[in-house]
């Protein structure tokens, strides 16, 4: 006879007597050593999560890829943004600056694609990652060469179609569990042999606009008249990411990034206006606004708006992928930094076009 744990019970008399004798011997040995059954404790296994962790914290810890970055390593995404913005500013001031900016954007797209699976915590095949990287690199190269941002939607659409096509042809054939007449009572519906095709497709497609958005850096660098805006965007992006490290909650980090971004944009624009360069920069930056509020005021307002726009772009990345201080892998942290760098130039380019530049 077996109990619910699958342990066989011995019901004959001999088995019962021998079992009772064994229990008596164990009790005598515990009494002689000064231990009682209630005082004997089995050490609990070490927990993989902190003692005060909630259920959601334990779930995130279990699903997070390793190795985890802790301590100073958790700021790797911020260091990635600082490196990319520094390289962009350096490439822009050197001869052939547009080509250098394209190379920096291509590097960021490669970092995004290689770590996208760890950042999104979803399966992304090598083919999908290659398409994501190729979409960003190709768009930056075309826009940086022609100066036409109108190529971006077309290349993004082609990339999305390519991702969907790859996912369709690599997905397994569904199992049909129904009978030929289709009247089987209680028959389960057709199911995929491998679940997650649609979530994987959605995750891969989400990376395409981020990679393609990096072409905004190439568009800013292509126009020589937008040099002040390009350097302003680099400086504000770097300062905003530093401010985004302040605090321990998403709300505090977002507020710090917004305040620091506004202050940085205001300070940089005020310095340019105080140096007397507003008359040379405003006609190519915000000509429509300059005709209404004046050149110096237009430049200062442009700096403030740049700080707000870049801050919101960085906050959006953190809102999409969770707090940047959460445990993550090295590739995921680098991909997060690349994503922040790529999207930070999109609102700046939009302001230039809306302002009449």
Task: List the predicted regions and their residue ranges.
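C-terminal transmembrane helix-loop-helix hairpin of multi-pass membrane proteins
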Residues: 71-73, 77-78, 251-357
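Structural signature of hydrophobic alpha-helical transmembrane segments
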Residues: 91-108, 148-161, 221-238, 296-312
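Hydrophobic alpha-helical segments and helix pairs
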Residues: 151-227
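Internal active-site segments that recognize and position negatively charged phosphoryl groups
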Residues: 194-276
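C-terminal ends of transmembrane helices
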Residues: 62-65, 109-123, 162-196, 239-255, ...
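N-terminal signal-anchor module of multipass membrane proteins
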Residues: 2-15, 19-113, 348-352
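Central hydrophobic cores of alpha-helical transmembrane segments in multi-pass inner-membrane proteins
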Residues: 84-85, 104-115, 135-139, 158-167
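Cytoplasmic-side transmembrane-helix entry/capping segments in multi-pass membrane proteins
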Residues: 123-134, 151-157, 179, 191-207, ...
């Amino acid at each position: 006879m077996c109990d619910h744990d699958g342990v066989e019970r011995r019901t004959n008399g001999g088995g019962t007597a021998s079992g009772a004798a064994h229990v008596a011997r164990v009790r005598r040995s515990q009494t002689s050593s000064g231990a009682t059954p209630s005082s004997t404790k089995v050490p609990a296994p070490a927990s993989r999560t902190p003692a005060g962790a909630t259920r959601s914290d334990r779930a995130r810890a279990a699903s997070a890829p390793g190795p985890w970055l802790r301590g100073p390593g958790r700021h790797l995404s911020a260091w990635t943004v600082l490196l990319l913005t520094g390289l962009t500013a350096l490439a822009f001031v050197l001869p052939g600056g547009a080509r250098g900016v394209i190379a920096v954007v291509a590097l960021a797209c490669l970092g995004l694609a290689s770590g996208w699976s760890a950042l999104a915590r979803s399966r992304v095949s090598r083919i999908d990652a290659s398409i994501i990287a190729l979409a960003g690199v190709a768009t930056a190269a075309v826009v940086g060469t022609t100066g036409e941002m109108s190529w971006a939607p077309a290349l993004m659409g082609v990339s999305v179609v390519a991702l969907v096509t790859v996912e369709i042809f690599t997905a397994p054939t569904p199992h049909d569990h129904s009978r030929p007449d289709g009247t089987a009572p209680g028959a389960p519906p057709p199911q995929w042999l491998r679940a997650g095709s649609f979530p994987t497709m959605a995750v891969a497609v989400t990376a395409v606009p981020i990679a393609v958005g990096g072409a905004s850096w190439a568009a800013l660098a292509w126009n020589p008249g937008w040099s002040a805006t390009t350097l302003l965007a680099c400086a504000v992006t770097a300062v905003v990411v530093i401010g985004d490290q302040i605090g321990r909650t998403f709300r505090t980090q977002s507020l710090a990034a917004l305040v620091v971004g506004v202050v940085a944009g205001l300070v940089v624009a005020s310095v340019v206006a105080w140096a007397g360069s507003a008359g040379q920069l405003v006609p190519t930056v915000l000509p429509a606004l300059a005709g209404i509020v004046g050149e110096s005021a237009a430049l200062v307002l442009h700096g403030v708006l740049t700080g707000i726009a870049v801050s919101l772009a960085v906050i959006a990345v953190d809102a999409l992928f969770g707090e940047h201080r959460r445990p993550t892998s090295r590739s995921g942290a680098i991909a997060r930094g690349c994503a922040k760098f790529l999207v930070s130039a999109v609102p700046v380019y939009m302001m230039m076009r809306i302002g009449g530049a």
